[in-house]
C-alpha cells in the first residue's frame, strides 16, 4: 500500500519548509523554502559550522567596516545554506529578503539583486532561485519590478485576499498563503477552538485564492504554507504546491493510504477585474483584522530572528 506523502505527490508538488539538509535527503522534495527563522535554526546545526565560517571569512574580504561585514556575512550564510540545499533538490530554493525592508520597495529590490548575485557568482542560475518578499504593497511592487528583470519571486506572509489579488495582478511567480498562522489567530481571538479540516479558516482562505486564480487564468503558483496538522495538508491536496515542515512530512510518509484530490479547476476562465489600486488594497486588507495582525506579527518575528542571526555572526567577526 502507498503512503500518504507519495499519494499527495500525484496531485501536488511537495516542497520542504526547512533549512535542514538531513530532512532534504530523507524526503526528497522538489523545492525548498527558507526564512530568517529557519536560517537561524539551521545555523545552530554543527554540520553547518563550516558554512558560517566561510561566510564570515568572505565578509571580512569584502569590507573593513564591521557593520557591513555583519550584513555581508548574514547574506552569504543564507546563500551558503541555499547552495547546500540545491545539491539535494532538483528545483528551486527560496531565500528571503531582510524583513526590515518590507516597507521599502527600492531597498528590497537592491537586496534581492544582491542575493541573486551571490547565487550567480556560485554558478547558480536564476531559474533555480526564488526571492522571498513579504506581501506588503511595497514588497509586491518590488516583486513586480524584479519579475520584469527575470528574477522570480515568492510572496510570503500572505493572509488576505487583497494581498493575493495584488500579487496575481503584479505577475509574481509564486505566493505562499499561510494556513496554520490563520488558524492560530482564530483560535486565540474567537471562542471556537476546534475546526474540522474543511472548515479550518486557513484552508478556506487558500481554497478561495486557488479558485480565484484558476477562474481568472492567473499563472501565479499557489503554494500553501505554515501547516499545523496533516488534516490541513490533506484538505489542500491538488493545490499547485505545498511547503511542509519535516515533522509533517514524516507523519505523511508513515501514514498508509491513498488520498483524495480536493482542489482542481476545470471551468471556464472569466475576464479579470481592473487592477487593484494601492488605496483599495490597503482598505480591503485592513478590513481583515486577522490579516493585519498576522502580517505585522510575521514581519516582526522574522526581523527579530534576523537580528539574532546578525548578533551571532557579529560575535564571530
UniProtKB/Swiss-Prot annotation:
GO terms for biological process: carbohydrate metabolic process; pentose-phosphate shunt, non-oxidative branch. Keywords: Cytoplasm, Pentose shunt, Schiff base, Transferase. One of its GO terms (cellular component) is cytosol. It is found in: Cytoplasm. GO terms for molecular function: transaldolase activity. Pathway: Carbohydrate degradation; pentose phosphate pathway; D-glyceraldehyde 3-phosphate and beta-D-fructose 6-phosphate from D-ribose 5-phosphate and D-xylulose 5-phosphate (non-oxidative stage): step 2/3. Its EC number is 2.2.1.2. SUPFAM superfamilies: Aldolase. Its main location: cytoplasm. It catalyses: D-sedoheptulose 7-phosphate + D-glyceraldehyde 3-phosphate = D-erythrose 4-phosphate + beta-D-fructose 6-phosphate. It is an enzyme of class 2 (transferase). The active site is at residue 132. Pfam families: TAL_FSA. Homodimer. Belongs to the transaldolase family. Type 1 subfamily. PANTHER family: TRANSALDOLASE (PTHR10683:SF18). Transaldolase is important for the balance of metabolites in the pentose-phosphate pathway. This is Transaldolase B. The lineage of its organism: Bacteria, Pseudomonadati, Pseudomonadota, Gammaproteobacteria, Enterobacterales.
Amino acid at each position: 500500500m502507498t503512503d500518504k506523502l507519495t499519494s499527495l505527490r500525484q496531485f501536488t508538488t511537495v516542497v520542504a519548509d526547512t533549512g535542514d539538509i538531513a530532512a532534504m535527503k530523507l524526503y526528497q522534495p522538489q523545492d525548498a523554502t527558507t526564512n530568517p527563522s529557519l536560517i537561524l535554526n539551521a545555523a545552530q546545526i554543527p554540520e553547518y559550522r563550516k558554512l558560517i565560517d566561510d561566510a564570515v571569512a568572505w565578509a571580512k574580504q569584502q569590507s573593513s567596516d564591521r557593520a557591513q561585514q555583519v550584513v555581508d556575512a548574514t547574506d552569504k550564510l543564507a546563500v551558503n545554506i541555499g547552495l547546500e540545499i540545491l545539491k539535494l533538490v532538483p528545483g528551486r530554493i527560496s531565500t528571503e529578503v531582510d524583513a526590515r525592508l518590507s516597507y521599502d520597495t527600492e531597498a528590497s529590490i537592491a537586496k534581492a539583486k544582491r542575493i541573486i548575485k551571490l547565487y550567480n557568482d556560485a554558478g547558480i542560475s536564476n531559474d533555480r532561485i526564488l526571492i522571498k518578499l513579504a506581501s506588503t504593497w511595497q514588497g509586491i511592487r518590488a516583486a513586480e519590478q524584479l519579475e520584469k528583470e527575470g528574477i522570480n519571486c515568492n510572496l510570503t506572509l500572505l493572509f488576505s485576499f487583497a494581498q493575493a489579488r495584488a500579487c496575481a495582478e503584479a505577475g509574481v511567480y509564486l505566493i505562499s498563503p499561510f494556513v496554520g498562522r490563520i488558524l492560530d489567530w482564530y483560535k486565540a481571538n474567537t471562542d471556537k477552538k476546534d475546526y474540522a479540516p474543511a472548515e479550518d479558516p486557513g484552508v478556506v482562505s487558500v481554497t478561495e485564492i486557488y479558485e480565484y486564480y484558476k477562474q481568472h487564468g492567473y499563472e501565479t503558483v499557489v503554494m500553501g504554507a505554515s501547516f499545523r496538522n496533516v488534516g490541513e495538508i490533506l484538505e489542500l491536496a491538488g493545490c499547485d504546491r505545498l511547503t511542509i515542515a519535516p515533522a509533517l512530512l514524516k507523519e505523511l510518509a508513515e501514514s498508509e493510504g491513498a488520498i483524495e484530490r480536493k482542489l482542481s479547476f476545470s471551468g471556464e476562465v472569466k475576464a479579470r477585474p481592473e487592477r487593484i489600486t494601492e488605496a483599495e488594497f490597503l482598505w480591503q486588507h485592513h478590513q481583515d483584522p486577522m490579516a493585519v495582525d498576522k502580517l505585522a506579527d510575521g514581519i516582526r518575528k522574522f526581523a527579530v530572528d534576523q537580528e539574532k542571526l546578525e548578533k551571532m555572526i557579529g560575535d564571530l567577526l
